[in-house]
Amino acid sequence: VKLSASMGLEIPILGSDTLDSNMVLEAASGSDVKLYVSTFYQEGGSPEFDEGIKAWLNEDATAMTNNGGNDTIAAVTAMGYDAYYVALEALKAAGSTDPAAVKAALPGVTYTGVTGDIAFDDIGDAIRDTAYIKVADTANNAWALETMQKAG
């Protein structure tokens, strides 16, 4: 992102949820780079989750440092949170901690988490119904919601 800015790139950078990071946002800060990401969570989507994560970050200096020095919530944080609970549901459905049994149970797991509804197809790939398009507000060092798209 910094290289793009220094070279005067005039076309937008489009990225996936892995670019939905406060570290990437920091790299774009103060530049004229247009940076868009498609992602699975927008801060404010679950106020209770946001409040809990921000409280934890602000109470733990190491967590704050690991989060880039601020309490911006990246989609991967919310996705990791939901993944933990999905894994618990898969363990319950399997009735076992055997990896093969858990994998076999996964297609039957559905879960409504902070990132929305989560289900799985017959080979275990996640089926998601919501995507957020965010744009880097480089003047204010924040992500701004551009649009939300829901399937179905």
Question: Could you say what each language-model-derived stretch is?
Answer:
Residues 3-81, 135-151:
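Extracellular/periplasmic periplasmic-binding protein-like sensory domains
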Residues 61-78, 84-142:
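Segments of small-molecule ligand-sensing domains
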